[in-house]
Regions:
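Glycine-rich hexapeptide-repeat left-handed beta-helix
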Residues: 2-29, 66, 72-74, 80-87, ...
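A positional/architectural concept
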Residues: 32-77, 81-87
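Short proline/glycine- and basic residue-enriched helix-capping loop/turn segments at helix->loop/beta transitions
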Residues: 100
Length: 211
């Protein structure tokens, strides 16, 4: 997809009020995305950000590829209020496939492998490597240089290994959430909903405006 096509696709993301996400180039580098992605109208994506297919970037999120790069695989969902950033001249941020970044989480200058759930409000700091099939529990703080083992749950402040993950949890939680967010994003790509009838059901509605 060309830079012009990408910019158009991002800027034309669906919204109920006609709003558009804030998409900005940094040093001439424009964010790009794959096929069938959704970007909420008040999300912000800037600079050297590359998204794969079927990704979703939700309301009030910020992806700042200004001081370094951000790379996202396929089927990554960045939920409401989350922030993804990187560190100047040190660490970019790389996120694999089938990854969920929970509401208000912060992911900064790290590597997250495939099939990972970063819980709501969690913080993943610079030079962290989160192995595949893992969960970072809600509210956890994963300190710099931590190596999260594959197939584990890390929790706490600072985050430590809590336990190994069963296959049932991988399929029932990590995969389920990623699949659901692909489905949710599809709801916003449907044709615009019909105009609702005026309050009270009569007249042209001009005298029924809620105050």
């Amino acid at each position: 997809m060309s830079e012009q096509e990408t910019a158009g696709s991002l800027n034309n993301s669906p919204s109920g009020d006609g709003g558009k996400p804030l998409i900005l180039p940094v040093k001439g580098v424009m964010p790009t995305m794959g096929n069938n992605c959704f970007v909420a109208p008040n999300a912000t994506i800037v600079g050297d950000v590359v998204m794969g297919d079927e990704c979703s970037v939700w309301f009030n999120t910020v992806l700042r590829g200004d001081v370094n790069f951000i790379r996202m695989g396929n089927r990554v969902n960045v939920q409401d209020g989350a922030i993804i950033h990187c560190t100047y001249q040190k660490t970019g941020t790389t996120i694999g496939n089938n990854v969920s970044i929970g509401h208000n989480a912060i992911v900064h200058g790290c590597v997250i492998d495939d099939n990972v759930l970063v819980g709501m409000g969690a913080i993943v700091m610079d030079n962290v490597h989160v192995g595949s099939n893992s969960i970072i529990a809600a509210g956890s703080v994963v300190l710099e240089n931590t190596k999260v083992e594959s197939g584990t749950i890390y929790a706490g402040v600072p985050a430590k290994k809590l336990k190994d993950i069963s296959q049932e949890l991988i399929h029932g939680e990590i995969n389920r959430i990623a699949e659901n967010y692909v489905m949710y994003s599809g709801w916003f790509k449907d044709p615009a909903p019909p105009i609702l009838p005026p309050v009270g059901g009569e007249g042209n509605g001009e005298d029924q405006i809620r105050r």
